[in-house]
């Protein structure tokens, strides 16, 4: 769990390099946040209204593929409200006591951020319901005939949940979030803005055409954009003059295995598995996962959304299928007859 307040700064000597850099690049206000315009504009209104009334913001649920800024929005909301933020994740809350410890340490109007909230176990999730609805904990003391119920009042707080798998949330939990927003992939222009902002913070000279090239290969995802920028900085410092030019960006991205379409080695491995081993599909995701040596959840959460968004993959009731664009990408001849009906 990470706990921070608006005036807090994380101690740099205890953070791994990537975590420290990610924290330094994270926007701290709505004005610094790039992209997701409709979502941000609504959140500004909700936050301003809650702040003017002196109330806790309604509970929020942010969904969407990984790396689009759900965690950043949670931190921004806490900063804009001027309250503390307590950060944890669904898998970390194994027992009711884990959740009770967090909730009883909240101050009035604080933000509790639960990442991967779809991975909460059922017992912990049910324990959360009265806390969300009535700001109350229902605790059972002792067991058997001596058991007795005890209610603990909690200060009003805001729960912000983040998920990449909205469909795995139970209806009772999902319905308790009064604010629900989905984050979408970023366009290239927004990613260019993020690149230039990050480059300024890190002190990296970055040419405009180089930023355009990196943005086009970033899968519409700011986290990937910033990760690529850090790797290009390494190439620029070791093999160049410290400046990221278009030529250096193109050569370095090629060496990193990120092509002009934004596909990386695992994307290509997944698609080639469908094409070469299973005749273009349909094939089940479990079979794909076993063939490429990757977890099913990772394929569904990280790789498939982008591949489907870009038209490289089709999901059908019978399994995953390659598309005509996939055959064109690999310069392969598509099958002469339909591979099967969707019905």
Swiss-Prot record:
Q: Where does DNA bind?
A: 296, 315, 320
Instruction: Locate the region Large ATPase domain (RuvB-L).
Output: 1-186
Group of enzyme by EC: hydrolase
Q: Where does Mg(2+) bind?
A: 71
Give the start-end ranges of region Head domain (RuvB-H): 260-343
Q: Which SUPFAM superfamilies match?
A: P-loop containing nucleoside triphosphate hydrolases, Winged helix' DNA-binding domain
Which keywords annotate this record?
ATP-binding, Cytoplasm, DNA damage, DNA recombination, DNA repair, DNA-binding, Hydrolase, Nucleotide-binding
Q: What segment(s) does the record annotate as region Small ATPAse domain (RuvB-S)?
A: 187-257
Q: Which domain of life is it from?
A: Bacteria
Report the GO terms under cellular component: cytoplasm; Holliday junction resolvase complex
Q: Name one GO molecular function term.
A: four-way junction DNA binding
Please give the SMART domains that the UniProt record associates with this protein.
AAA (SM00382)
Give the UniProt family note: Belongs to the RuvB family.
Record note on domains: Has 3 domains, the large (RuvB-L) and small ATPase (RuvB-S) domains and the C-terminal head (RuvB-H) domain. The head domain binds DNA, while the ATPase domains jointly bind ATP, ADP or are empty depending on the state of the subunit in the translocation cycle. During a single DNA translocation step the structure of each domain remains the same, but their relative positions change.
Its biological function? Answer: The RuvA-RuvB-RuvC complex processes Holliday junction (HJ) DNA during genetic recombination and DNA repair, while the RuvA-RuvB complex plays an important role in the rescue of blocked DNA replication forks via replication fork reversal (RFR). RuvA specifically binds to HJ cruciform DNA, conferring on it an open structure. The RuvB hexamer acts as an ATP-dependent pump, pulling dsDNA into and through the RuvAB complex. RuvB forms 2 homohexamers on either side of HJ DNA bound by 1 or 2 RuvA tetramers; 4 subunits per hexamer contact DNA at a time.
Description of how the protein assembles with itself and partners: Homohexamer. Forms an RuvA(8)-RuvB(12)-Holliday junction (HJ) complex. HJ DNA is sandwiched between 2 RuvA tetramers; dsDNA enters through RuvA and exits via RuvB. An RuvB hexamer assembles on each DNA strand where it exits the tetramer. Each RuvB hexamer is contacted by two RuvA subunits (via domain III) on 2 adjacent RuvB subunits; this complex drives branch migration. In the full resolvosome a probable DNA-RuvA(4)-RuvB(12)-RuvC(2) complex forms which resolves the HJ.
Name the record gives this protein: Holliday junction branch migration complex subunit RuvB
The organism is: Myxococcus xanthus (strain DK1622)
What lineage is this protein's organism placed in?
Answer: Bacteria, Pseudomonadati, Myxococcota, Myxococcia, Myxococcales
Q: Which gene encodes it?
A: ruvB
